[in-house]
Swiss-Prot record:
This is UPF0177 protein YxdF. GO terms for molecular function: endopeptidase activity. Pfam families: Rce1-like. Keywords: Cell membrane, Membrane, Transmembrane, Transmembrane helix. The chain crosses the membrane at residues 2-22, 30-50, 117-137, 152-172. It comes from Lactococcus lactis subsp. lactis (strain IL1403).
Length: 177
């Protein structure tokens, strides 16, 4: 796995996709990114609640079978794959390569986002939550053409999305309304 990630980075570096990745990192950018991560996790929660309350589907998870495969691996390996390998490789593909290859940025935004959601869900009701998530992650990338920022948001959702949904659900149940 690590060898694959190293090869992906070498190819991306040779093709020039890593140009803006480490420029101008300051406290303002870090707080902006933390806000985006929180916003994304909250949006993920709201979409999940909306989809489940309307009973379009019974659970909001990808139906690609990846969770079955990952479930057989040790937890540390799962976190490594979901938190590092998958976000970095998918962001290089969908944001750096696909988004970066299309000159019309609105078309690039739409194609990159929709392809990301389709690869994760196929043509199913699961598409809606993934499409909204993909729009947010693509927007983060489009702000500075920096795939590391979008990979951080992507990784946060992969690692903390389920926990955030449970935490926010508990929080909203405690509110007196």
């Amino acid at each position: 796995m690590t060898l694959v990630l190293i090869l992906i980075f070498i190819i991306a570096w040779k093709l020039g996709y890593l140009k803006n990745t480490l420029k101008n990192w300051d406290l303002k950018r870090i707080f902006w990114l933390m806000g985006i991560v929180f916003f994304t996790l909250a949006t993920n929660y709201l979409v999940t609640v909306l989809v489940l309350k309307t009973q379009i589907i019974s659970s909001v998870t990808s139906d690609t079978g990846m969770s079955d495969i990952l479930g057989q691996l040790p937890i540390l390996c799962q976190k490594y794959i979901l938190g590092i390998i998958v976000p970095l490789s998918e962001e290089l593909l969908f944001r750096s390569y696909i988004f970066g290859s299309i000159t019309n940025k609105k078309v690039a935004f739409l194609i990159s986002s929709v392809l990301f959601a389709l690869v994760h869900t196929g043509f199913s009701w699961y598409l809606l939550p993934y499409l909204i998530l993909s729009f947010i992650i693509t927007w983060v990338y489009s702000k500075r053409n920096n795939f590391i920022e979008s990979a951080i948001v992507h990784s946060s959702v992969n690692l903390f999305g389920g926990s955030a949904i449970k935490l926010l659900d508990t929080f909203f149940k405690l509110l007196p309304y």
